[in-house]
């Protein structure tokens, strides 16, 4: 295992059924003014909103609501949230929802007291946060992003056709997160499986890099096997607690920075997928699904040993009588079968991607250097063309 690193994660997790009962003891650590952030209103239908608000009122909190956070939070919405937070001098931002809601809460937490344009400072120039940060807590209702235990925050600027993710330091991580697997039971299937693939993609982005014997790779193989097993159960039985709890826990560990330690990481699938999202506003997990197979088939020759290992250790491909390339190809074929089994979108046209967009999407994709192949913009266009053939 190469490299030197420090590992620390400041987020306190409460995991399991009825874990919302721990919210009052966390609320007691913060001041009176709480900004309650949530999405389109599903939490009002399933009773979570009522339960959270009651605990806030019982705790003597003054609640300022910021509803309507969209699946790909926009810059305009961020400015609105900053205004609410600053005008009301909120002491805590409580995000109740999925990854987009938690991402948005973190964006508001660092941006509300920014003296210049936070988009320019924190998302374009990637400057360090040097202003007051409002603490964030999270009540998770949808799995996928891992935002409940990391500093990640993705914001979309439609005017610039840009969707940019910023990974802030541990001072922006949620102070606490509450994870009750039963809150995920009623999620529509499309959103559920998109979240499952978001989890898988987070792991693969960190797995397909490096050539050393790295403990992190063994951890990721175990997470992938558990995810494949449990997701197959969950799509058949959405209220299977064991499966949904396993998936919720995998999602957290996939992106809480642990498995990236000692590794370079890739993230090109996310760069291309986020650029697709900036043009189409498509569901994030589905953009990753559409890009993944063409991308991995493109880079496979440059990381053949790892793709062979992936096939054998994750998909149980039998190596006998096969070349290394055939083994690697069989692994990606098994992954494709699994993706089709779940009903994931593999064709970009289903997401609103058309030939006229490809150059723009490629130009909007940041080029990273942590994987097995540093792409050119022309290669990204070719990968995007393959997504339209699936």
Language-model segment annotations:
Residues 52, 80-82, 101-115, 149-152:
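Short Gly/Thr/Asp-enriched flexible loops that form oxyanion-binding sites at enzyme active sites
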Residues 171, 314, 318-390:
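C-terminal charged capping/lid subdomain of soluble metabolic enzymes
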Residues 206-334:
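Active-site segments that bind and position negatively charged phosphate/pyrophosphate groups
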Residues 90-106, 141-147, 279:
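Glycine/serine-rich anion-binding loops at beta->alpha junctions
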Residues 20-23, 44-48, 75-78, 100-105, ...:
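Short glycine/serine/threonine-rich phosphate/pyrophosphate-binding segments
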Residues 11, 114-212, 309:
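A glycine/threonine-rich phosphate-anchoring loop and its flanking beta-alpha core
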Residues 1-92:
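ATP/NTP phosphate-donor binding region
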């Amino acid at each position: 295992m190469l490299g030197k690193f420090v590992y620390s994660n400041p987020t306190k997790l409460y995991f399991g059924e009825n874990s919302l009962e721990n919210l009052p003891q966390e609320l007691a650590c913060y001041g009176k003014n709480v900004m309650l952030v949530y999405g389109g209103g599903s939490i009002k239908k399933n009773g979570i909103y009522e339960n959270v608000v009651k605990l806030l009122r019982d705790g003597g909190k003054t609640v300022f609501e910021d509803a309507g956070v969209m699946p790909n939070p926009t810059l305009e919405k961020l400015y609105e949230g900053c205004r609410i937070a600053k005008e009301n001098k909120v002491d805590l931002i409580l995000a109740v929802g999925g990854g987009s809601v938690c991402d948005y809460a973190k964006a508001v937490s660092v941006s509300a007291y920014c003296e210049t344009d936070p988009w320019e400072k924190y998302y374009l120039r990637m400057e360090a946060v040097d202003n007051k940060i409002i603490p964030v807590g999270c009540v998770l209702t949808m799995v996928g992003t891992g935002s409940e235990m990391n500093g990640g925050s993705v914001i979309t600027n439609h005017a610039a056709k840009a969707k940019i993710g910023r990974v802030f330091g541990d001072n922006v991580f949620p102070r606490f997160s509450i994870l009750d697997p039963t809150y995920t039971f009623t999620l529509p299937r499309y959103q559920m499986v998109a979240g499952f693939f978001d989890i898988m993609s987070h792991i693969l982005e960190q797995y397909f890099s490096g050539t050393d014997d790295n403990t992190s790779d063994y951890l990721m193989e175990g997470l992938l096997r558990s995810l494949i097993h449990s997701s197959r159960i969950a799509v058949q039985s959405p209220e299977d607690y064991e499966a949904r709890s396993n998936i919720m826990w995998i999602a957290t560990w996939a992106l809480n920075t642990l498995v990236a330690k000692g590794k370079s990481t890739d993230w090109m699938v996310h760069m291309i997928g986020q650029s697709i999202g900036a043009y189409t506003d498509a569901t994030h997990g589905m953009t990753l699904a559409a890009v993944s197979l063409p991308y991995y088939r493109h880079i496979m020759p440059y990381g053949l040993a790892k793709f062979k290992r992936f096939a054998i250790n994750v998909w149980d491909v039998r190596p006998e009588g096969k070349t290394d390339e055939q083994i690697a190809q069989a692994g990606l074929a098994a992954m494709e079968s699994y993706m089709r089994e779940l009903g994931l979108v593999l064709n970009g046209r289903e997401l609103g991607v058309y030939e006229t967009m490809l150059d723009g999407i490629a130009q909007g994709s940041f080029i990273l250097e942590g994987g097995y192949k540093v792409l050119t913009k022309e290669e990204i266009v070719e990968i995007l063309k393959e997504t339209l053939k699936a």
